[in-house]
């Protein structure tokens, strides 16, 4: 979405994004990053994309306010493309009246022009959030369609029974589990080759949900 070439390359090279973010933000080698520092980076990698404030990061990562402020500033200094993308979403929301996912699904954004501060800031957060989470949802729906079609062809009787966030559960006979695993990995990892970012899928097999 932000077309951050460095971040895309890191994903495609299987680099631990949270560790690298921590190393860059704290200005230390990756091998010296502690679990606590990685946790802070993980909070910021996810939270800042969804409009997390300095106060929110401070509370979520158990940091002092000024530390959280410095971390966010360093993060956006390192990830200029992400800052430009998020700022651009607000401009689009105000000027065009909508934002959209990578695949073109739109959300109207009339409240970004509201004179009510609370209403306006909530709408701004939604405008920055929707294209990201919405694209994730689009990818998941596309993957489910592809998985369902392929299961019908290759594993008759297997069926999707639950979808939660970025995962799906397929119910099948025990002797079908290996082929179902292949279908899931192939179809979910290959759901959107046009985006240029490698999608990695892990598959687990169990007799019930608790074993997965």
Model-derived features: where do they sit?
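Conserved catalytic core of nucleotide polymerization and phosphodiester-bond processing enzymes
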Residues: 1-212
